[in-house]
Amino acid sequence: MLTFENVLTVFRDYLGQDPEEEVLPCRRGYVRISWNSDSRYCVDGVLCRTPEELFDLLLQDYWDFELIRRTRGRREATAADEKAVDELCQPYLDWRKEAQK
């Protein structure tokens, strides 16, 4: 069963590496906030009402983060880059499948 807590545990390492993403609890679930480097203003905030929504959002954030790391943000991503990032995401998808049993 997915819970907010185990989703956050699974993505703990990623969230520790990405200085622009933060997840905070709120009355309606959890909010993922994106910061713009050193700005005091956030870029966006997304309310996740269910653990599934939080998982999906963090997986997409992780995918984007790893793709930017591969390209260093200096070139267009290739199909090989995208495939490599898909492979990095697979353990998260496998974990989700097991957690939903």
Positions of PLM-derived features:
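A structural signal for alpha-helix termini and helix-coil/disorder junctions
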Residues: 17, 60, 64, 95-98
